[in-house]
Swiss-Prot record:
Described function: Required for maturation of urease via the functional incorporation of the urease nickel metallocenter.
Subunit structure comment from the entry: UreD, UreF and UreG form a complex that acts as a GTP-hydrolysis-dependent molecular chaperone, activating the urease apoprotein by helping to assemble the nickel containing metallocenter of UreC. The UreE protein probably delivers the nickel.
Compartments (UniProt record): Cytoplasm
Keyword Zinc listed: no
Taxonomic classification: Bacteria, Pseudomonadati, Pseudomonadota, Gammaproteobacteria, Oceanospirillales
Gly residues biased stretches: 15-26
Positions of region (Disordered): 1-30
PANTHER family registered for this protein in UniProt: UREASE ACCESSORY PROTEIN D
Protein name as catalogued: Urease accessory protein UreD
Molecular functions (GO terms): nickel cation binding
Keywords (A to Z) from UniProt: Chaperone, Cytoplasm, Nickel insertion
Length: 313
């Protein structure tokens, strides 16, 4: 079991009568509570169509059947017909002790698009301050394209946990994805004033690190309110794209096509394109990311963007 505690969290007491043995998921509500779920998916090109050839799950983390909304011949297509998959987590959010692990692999020639049917919610920690964890590993083999496009994450006041995303790209594999995070519930007058969330990103190509980032979000730290850090903003988003044949030209295309605003910026380094949003409008962050993806999609796949139907419900 991964240690999800932060410095200063109370140590786990000895197990007593009625407690579940350590190391497994169980109905317990002390500092050792642990609810694990995992999902492992694999995609492969079979006769010009991307097939989901591996789907293993443990706990309440599954997928709907694959969708194929992009039928039809595309001249000079680099990949097989795309497969759209929706990741389902019926609880709808993470509470203390939850630990989700998602592993996605796209093999050579495959083109997979993954999203979620709704926003992910990060709930307030329990009275013990037990953390949650969500860990995503994306593996892209040479000649494959993976699109990781989850709906936004809503972080409630008092939430404590870690989100990590690891991208392992090989050869000329391509990947585009985003993370949109909204802190607190301003509309309900419930800002994010307590708790601690940490986000980690790591991207490698052929084992070589191209982008690593660790971002702790602690409303009690000066960084959270200082203009040199979060600046008190409640919404942030990061979009990445790796594998573009002309990343600087893609940057210029985004600057030309997206509405000008001081809340977003885009750049590229080491052939990794990064777009950032920092502000207070969740819808604006989502729209910027979606518009950027629609611009980049043809650059990556020779196909126009096909918006998942679930986004429109």
């Amino acid at each position: 079991m991964t240690d999800l505690s932060f410095p200063g969290q109370a140590a786990s007491p000895g197990e007593g009568a009625g407690q579940t043995p350590s190391g497994g998921s169980g109905h317990r509500f002390d500092t050792r509570r642990h609810w694990a779920a995992s999902l492992s998916l694999g995609f492969r090109d079979r006769d010009g169509r991307t097939r989901m050839t591996r789907a293993r799950h443990h706990g309440p983390l599954r997928v709907q059947r694959p969708f194929y909304p992009e039928t039809g011949h595309v001249p000079d297509a680099r990949y097989a017909e795309p497969c759209h998959v929706y990741l389902l987590h019926p609880p709808g959010g993470l509470v203390s002790g939850d630990e989700l692990r998602i592993d996605i692999e796209a093999e050579s020639g495959a083109h997979a698009l993954l999203t979620t049917p709704a926003a992910t919610k990060l709930y307030r920690a329990d009275s013990h301050g037990v953390c949650w964890g969500q860990h995503t590993h994306l593996s892209v083999r040479p000649g494959a394209l993976l699109e990781w496009l989850p709906q936004e994450t809503l972080c409630f006041d008092g939430a404590r946990g870690m989100q990590s995303t690891t991208l392992d790209v090989q050869g000329d594999g391509c990947c585009v994805g985003w993370e949109v995070l909204a802190l607190g519930r301003p509309a309900s007058q419930l800002p994010f004033v307590s708790g601690r969330v940490e986000q980690r990103f790591a991207l490698t190509r052929d084992g070589r690190p191209l982008w690593r980032e660790r971002q702790p979000l602690d409303p009690m730290h000066p960084r959270f309110h200082g203009y040199w850090g979060q600046g008190g903003s409640t919404v942030q988003a990061t979009l990445w794209a790796v594998g573009l044949t002309a990343p600087q030209a893609a940057v210029e295309a985004l600057r030309e096509c997206l509405p000008a605003s001081r809340h977003w910026a885009v750049t590229q380094r080491r052939d990794v394109l990064l777009l950032r949003y920092l502000g207070d409008e969740r819808n604006a962050a989502w729209e910027i990311c979606q518009q950027a993806w629609e611009v980049l999609r043809p650059w990556l796949s020779s196909r126009q963007a096909s918006v998942p139907r679930i986004w429109m419900t």
